[in-house]
Amino acid sequence: MRELYLKTLKKEVVPSEGCTEPIAIAYAASIAAEYLKGEIKEVNIYLSKNVIKNALGVGIPGTGGVGIEIAAALGISIQKSYKKLTILSNFTEDELKKAKEIVDKNIINIKQKNTNKALYIEVELLSETSKAKVIIEDTHTNVTLIECDDEIIMDNNSEVSEDLEEDYNLFKIADIYNFAKEADFDDIKFILESAKMNEKVSEEGLKGDYGLQVGSKIIQKGNFNLFSNDASNKIIAASAAASDARMDGCAMPIMTTAGSGNQGIACSIPVAQTSRLLDKSEEELARALVLSNLVTIRIKKHMGRLSPLCGAGIAGATGASCGITYLLGGDLENINYCINNMISDLSGMICDGAKETCALKIATGTNAAIQCANLAINGISATANDGIVAKDVEETIESIETLIQNGFKNVDDTILNIMLEKKKNNK
């Protein structure tokens, strides 16, 4: 299991600049543009409903704009697909100008793809003499098809991502805990970079007027702040501020977890802040971050890569709560208590797309993470008498999957319809 856990962390904890769904669209568009011959006359983008939901209203770093069109146009303009999820970092003024010209031509068409896949991106570019198509499925960088002028350049048939996702079924909380506790520090110290990178964005979020300013307003000084200047509120503020900045288009990289920057924020910053508060060593922090990230990944396996439920508020915050519990001296039993408490608290938090108000969900999740860790370390847990919580923590986690599959079948459709109707009425 050691090698699987290390492989998973290195695959699932990776840097990205901006929200991952529009970046994945930019990545696909960039690949297609690199193959197309001639001047682009038409751009057709086919997306799963979950991708539309998460790309529709989120800020695109360095553009002052939001949404799918500018992200795709930038990918076409930049044509540096080798950068993958950092493709939107350090683009030039000329590249931005060209992207805006593409948007202004009104040649970008966006359509919903009728697919069972939560994450599906298809970008088709046409010129007078050429056509290029790229498909991404299942994970944000899993390119499954590249086609140019009816020639198949690459056809991966989505096998790679599915194989690794299947391995996540082997993850058990007890095994994750033991790995985090016993792994060689040299093998896991790379995970410290996730906290360093994300805390830099948090610092920027606390300084600037990003989004709703959820983080900065929690710790502002003045007559109208109802929050006290205590440790928990500082942790909540730091976490929310990173999301404030990221969702408002801050041009700084974020370390993602399981395909989401907000999940990366939610499972790293509260743990790092708690570690500093408790004066823990780098090794202790690394072990807590390994636990937090792997718990997040495990829960996300049952939620789905994109979900009607909030991955940051549920999976990421639960991971953080486990990491905090570990730093407080908790053992496996306390970790199990912590997970039961968190799922009791936050299991109904919906995902209504990627946008500035994600910072509110991060704040809520972080507050719950602290509260549930505090209960767990004192030996207090939700029990099988309480709602969807089971006697065994593995069953509690699996209940989230049952909830989504059986109870939330139409939630994504309903949310997306509300969002699209609102956009149509606001034109």
Curated annotation (Swiss-Prot):
Lineage: superkingdom: Bacteria
Gene Ontology biological-process annotations: L-cysteine catabolic process to pyruvate
GO molecular function, one term: L-cysteine desulfhydrase activity
Record-given protein name: UPF0597 protein CPR_0790
Pfam families, per the entry: SDH_alpha
Family per record: Belongs to the UPF0597 family.
